[in-house]
């Protein structure tokens, strides 16, 4: 609701919540539907008012906030890698100057998926000691020693400072869940449009990507459906005006439909087509981004 919007007033917005402990009492939920400036001290506001039971998330209707995690969805979703040092990120040209067999992977963050990929790579020395890195990959060792260690030397966390050649978080759960998969599903944690896509298993995901250890296009189709998107908007959170995909409340609580084999096959086929079509169009038109694609789609709808 707008604060006083005059010359001597504060140009801010506030949210006020007043309640009392009574599980059976009817609450009132008023939502701003329109604002108009008629030259007075503030804005004239139109409200849409509903009366009913208010849940913990200050919403009425289905109590989405009370949904619990489903056992079937456990151990599947994880955040991407938290590297803790820009020195691990290198260009293809820089990678070419290091050992050909060094553990270097293609790297994608949220902007790479929604915008145009930077084409960068990531040094990932997980599972190796510093001595093993120095003996097997001396050039890579020197690169990380010069570009990561100086910053890590000032880190207050002993484990991060002492294991300077490794990423800040090892993400062992993520690595174990993706092991053996040819591809996995990823979505950007905070994004204007909720888009799910397949990433090749060779691609290292950034911490701002939510990764699902599933390679079945039937799952991709369900997650891309309007039903799941509606669930995400109700169960997730927001950052400014952008929805945030919280894996614990958006994925782990989501009840997948009990589809028949024929329905699964149809959804699987459509999802493969969708994923391939988007990637094909972006390959044919390098300036085309997923955000731009879905902005146009939103206008058409």
Question: Which residues make up each language-model segment?
Answer:
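Conserved beta strand-loop-helix elements of the APE1-like EEP
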Residues: 11-26
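S-adenosyl-L-methionine
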Residues: 1-14, 38, 42, 48-301
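Sec-type signal peptide cleavage vicinity
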Residues: 23, 34-36
């Amino acid at each position: 609701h707008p604060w006083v919007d005059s010359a001597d007033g504060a140009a801010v917005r506030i949210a006020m919540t007043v309640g009392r402990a009574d599980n059976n009492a009817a609450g009132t939920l008023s939502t701003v539907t329109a604002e108009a400036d008629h030259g007075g001290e503030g804005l004239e506001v139109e409200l849409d008012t509903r009366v009913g039971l208010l849940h913990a998330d200050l919403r009425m209707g289905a109590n989405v906030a009370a949904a619990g995690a489903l056992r079937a969805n456990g151990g599947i979703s994880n955040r991407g890698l938290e590297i803790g040092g820009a020195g691990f990120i290198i260009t293809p040209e820089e990678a070419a100057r290091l050992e050909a067999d060094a553990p270097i992977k293609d790297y994608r963050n949220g902007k790479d998926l929604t915008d145009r990929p930077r084409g960068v790579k990531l040094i990932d020395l997980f599972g190796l000691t510093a001595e093993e890195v120095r003996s097997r990959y001396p050039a890579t060792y020197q690169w990380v020693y010069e570009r990561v260690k100086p910053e890590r030397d000032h880190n207050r966390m002993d484990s991060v400072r002492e294991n300077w050649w490794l990423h800040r978080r090892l993400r062992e759960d993520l690595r174990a869940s993706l092991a053996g998969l040819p591809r996995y599903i990823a979505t950007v944690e905070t994004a204007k449009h909720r888009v799910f896509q397949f990433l090749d298993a060779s691609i290292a995901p950034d911490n701002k990507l939510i990764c699902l250890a599933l390679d079945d296009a039937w799952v991709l189709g369900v997650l891309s459906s309007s039903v799941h998107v509606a669930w995400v908007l109700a169960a997730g959170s927001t950052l400014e005006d952008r929805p945030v995909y919280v894996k614990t409340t958006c994925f782990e609580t989501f009840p997948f439909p009990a589809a028949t084999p024929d329905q699964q096959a149809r959804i699987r086929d459509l999802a493969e087509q969708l994923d391939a079509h988007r990637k094909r169009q972006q390959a044919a038109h390098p300036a085309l981004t997923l955000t731009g694609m879905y902005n146009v789609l939103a206008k058409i709808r």
